[in-house]
Amino acid sequence: MNNQKKYHLFDVLIYAILLALAFLFQSTSILFKYNSPAPSLVLALVLIISFYENYWFSAIFGLISGILLDIISVNGVGFHALTYMLTGIICSSVMKRYLQNNFASFAVISIPVVIIHQFAEILYSSGFDLGIITLFLKYYLIVAIYTFASAFVLYIIFRYTLKRSERFVKPKGIINKK
């Protein structure tokens, strides 16, 4: 096995551990009170991964992440899997074609994606009820703001960790294909 494949397998292992931690913190009340708005950490992780990987990997990661959420979700099967997969594909494609990987680009992409995802979630779970705007403003907008904040913090940590690992761990001549 060559060095490039070893490092990609190591990245996949790190992503799996991060997904397990994000899923654990999101689905339990370890950090947040029960039935209070909490950030969608898995969505934040899908956004971050889509900034660093190609669109196929981002789509598969989004699909697996969504399937995990659909298993415990009351909204029905398939919603999170489909939306997270599309999030991975679209964000990664836009990132690779039109933007540079920096904090401003992350903000430009993640803010509309999180708002659209939260609005789609409320439409899927509640239908087209008249109280949908009130519910969005009272609960889902707070979730979106928490998700923005957690995504930005995770992005900064991820970017710093990635720079340090490339500088100290990977031998010279190894280039990540993205």
Model-derived segments and their meaning:
Residues 1-178:
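Terminal, non-globular segments
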